[in-house]
Amino acid sequence: MDDNPTAVKLDQGGNQAPQGQGRRRLPKALGYITGDMKEFANWLKDKPQALQFVDWVLRGISQVVFVSNPISGILILVGLLVQNPWCALNGCVGTVVSTLTALLLNQDRSAITAGLQGYNATLVGILMAIYSDKGNYFWWLLFPVSAMSMTCPIFSSALNSVLSKWDLPVFTLPFNMALSMYLSATGHFNPFFPSTLVTPVTSVPNVTWPDLSALQLLKSLPVGVGQIYGCDNPWAGGIFLGAILLSSPLMCLHAAIGSLLGIIAGLSLSAPFENIYAGLWGFNSSLACIAIGGMFMALTWQTHLLALACALFTAYLGASMSHVMAVVGLPSCTWPFCLATLLFLLLTTKNPNIYKMPISKVTYPEENRIFYLQSTKRTVQGPL
């Protein structure tokens, strides 16, 4: 006689077992497409090289927002196409060229397969297209895009040699260096590749508070995330948030919070409303909030609050740097995010709940937190 009530219930209700199995299969199926899709990467190892290369490129496109997920890469590519197909094309060209260059330079294969040798060039391609004064479909631009994309693995390798001594990531420093170098070399008056003229503020902006639109502020939240890829379309920003959500809900939450804090910082400094609506106050703080809020620091309440502080600090630093760099005719790009986040990662504290992740163990926030909890448990049990 079987006294197991579960077994009796399943025998009497024949449809119970399939439903239970279905509920179990759904989280398992989601596990294959969320996170960093490690199982898919393992499955690709014995597949044709061309198929693997496509995976590396898609991961490179998504790595701009710290995501190593090819499906997220596809969604982000869709968002770029919604914004501007020409920018999407330049971003893809940059990613492909940079990844190929990394292969030719025999860079670390695990970094290449994770998309870490492509994401800087994704931004280089997109932003070179945006800052080009020749407009869309100026096909000659693909040559300097390819040339500058080839410098990204060189910058990455050189910076990694220095920053690895402190176990720090290179972030988008290679992108900032490559784009700043290109825009400085060409400028607005170059006869072949003129760029958009960047000028400092020379008069008091006309800010009329009664004209502030709540709807526009609401739209500026996804636009702030979209501006990470140089997109001012709220639909594109919404797609990017969905791509981040697919990989990590915690990252998506911090991306949105970071953009919101950027808006608040802009309002606190009485910034021109059009700049806030365009998301120019949100993208650096969004990246900073993701980086500290679970990506490069294990997520706890303490690091969550630290991420909020870093996002605000980044937004104010962005305002400062944009004024300074405009004097020499350059945009601030993601310099504020890189400098502010590196500063926060160099923070030393005796608080055990503020735990900086070893770079070799960084994956995505949920997995990082599991590693942190296991590491803490081993530390507690060690003396025993």
Curated annotation (Swiss-Prot):
GO annotations of cellular component type: basolateral plasma membrane; plasma membrane
Keywords: Cell membrane, Glycoprotein, Membrane, Transmembrane, Transmembrane helix, Transport
A GO MF term: urea transmembrane transporter activity
Glycosylated residues in this chain: 206
Protein's membrane topology: Multi-pass membrane protein
Primary localization: membrane
Disordered, as annotated region: 1-23
Cell location: Cell membrane; Basolateral cell membrane
Any GO BP: urea transmembrane transport
Important for channel permeability, annotated site positions: 334
Disulphide bonds in the chain: none
Spans traversing the lipid bilayer: 61-81, 85-105, 111-131, 138-158, 169-189, 237-257, 279-299, 327-347
Catalytic activity entry: urea(in) = urea(out)
Pfam families (alphabetical): UT (PF03253)
Function as written in the Swiss-Prot or TrEMBL entry: Mediates the transport of urea driven by a concentration gradient across the cell membranes of erythrocytes and the renal inner medullary collecting duct which is critical to the urinary concentrating mechanism. Facilitates water transport in erythrocytes.
Family the UniProt entry places it in: Belongs to the urea transporter family.
Subunit structure: Homotrimer; each subunit contains a pore through which urea permeates. Identified in a complex with STOM.
Name recorded for this polypeptide: Urea transporter 1
Source species taxonomy: Eukaryota, Metazoa, Chordata, Craniata, Vertebrata
